[in-house]
């Protein structure tokens, strides 16, 4: 069995291992943390399987570790403080419904990290081409946007009741979902860094940022949060004005006063 197959199996096994106690306890508190753990584990398996590591290998590995660790801790703290995650309110009581989320997480990790994993496992010269530098700039920009957005939202939720008021300050005055824009941007950066190392069929892994975009804007993320926000704040004129004047995803350069 090759290392690539082993990594996919590990991603699935981790979900099963943590799904069982989570279902028995009817809790979703560890879901996002396990997602981050799966990123860390699978990318680490790829990285430490390579004998002659290059600069690009180490950069990609470092970027994924930093992103997964920060996001996992942030999401775990959020669900712990909130006491629940609205995504799983009904699903966690039904075995197969809840299991679908966990298996979906294995797919999410595998497709999102595929470019990073294949790039690490692919042999390439230990150089840092201009294309990789462009990718690094994209990753750093995306990571900064996502981190700042999450921090601003965490501070807002501490000072306000999210069931009564919505965040529309900071980066959230420029985009209704700046954190998702940041995540899409940073995974695009990883794909650009990986581009120089891929050959043949490996170019298929460039689906990574496309999958992240589709997942966050079409399958979950934006659609779910927009629906929840409409239900909570749809009666507020300032919310309707915010929706009219603020892009869903790509931040605008200027911000309007709400």
Please place each PLM-identified region on the residue numbering.
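Short, small-residue-biased leader/transition segments that mark boundaries at the very start
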Residues: 1-3
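Hydrophobic transmembrane alpha-helices
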Residues: 5-15, 38-69, 109-152, 158-258
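C-terminal ends of transmembrane helices
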Residues: 16-27, 73-80
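Short, hydrophobic transmembrane alpha-helix segments
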Residues: 19-29, 46-53
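Transmembrane helix irregularities
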Residues: 24-25, 69, 103, 175
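Juxtamembrane helix-capping/reentrant segments at transmembrane boundaries
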Residues: 25-41, 83-101, 165-172
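Select subsegments of transmembrane alpha-helices in polytopic membrane proteins
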Residues: 31-33, 96-109, 176-183
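A basic- and aromatic-enriched beta-loop-alpha substructure that forms the phosphate/nucleotide-
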Residues: 56-92
């Amino acid at each position: 069995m090759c290392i690539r197959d082993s990594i996919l199996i590990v991603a699935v096994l981790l979900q099963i291992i943590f799904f069982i106690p989570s279902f028995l306890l009817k809790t979703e508190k560890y879901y996002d943390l396990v997602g981050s753990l799966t990123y860390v584990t699978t990318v680490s398996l790829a990285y430490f399987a390579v004998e002659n590591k290059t600069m690009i290998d180490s950069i990609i590995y470092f970027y994924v570790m930093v992103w997964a660790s920060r996001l996992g801790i942030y999401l775990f703290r959020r669900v712990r403080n909130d006491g629940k995650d609205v995504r799983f309110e009904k699903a966690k009581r039904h075995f197969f419904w809840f299991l679908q989320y966990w298996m979906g997480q294995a797919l999410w990790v595998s497709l999102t990290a595929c470019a990073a994993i294949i790039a690490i496992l692919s042999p390439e010269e230990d150089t840092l081409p201009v294309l990789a530098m462009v990718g690094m700039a994209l990753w750093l920009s995306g990571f900064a946007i996502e981190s700042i957005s999450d921090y601003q939202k965490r501070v807002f939720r501490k000072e306000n009741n999210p069931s009564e008021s919505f965040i529309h300050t900071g980066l959230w005055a420029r985009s209704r979902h700046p954190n998702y824009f940041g995540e899409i941007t940073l995974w695009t950066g990883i794909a650009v860094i990986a581009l120089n190392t891929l050959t043949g069929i490996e170019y298929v892994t460039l689906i990574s940022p496309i999958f992240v975009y589709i997942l966050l804007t079409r399958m979950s993320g934006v659609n779910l949060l927009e629906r929840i926000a409409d239900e909570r704040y749809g009666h507020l004129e300032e919310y309707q004005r915010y929706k009219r004047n603020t892009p869903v995803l790509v931040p605008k350069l200027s911000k309007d006063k709400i």
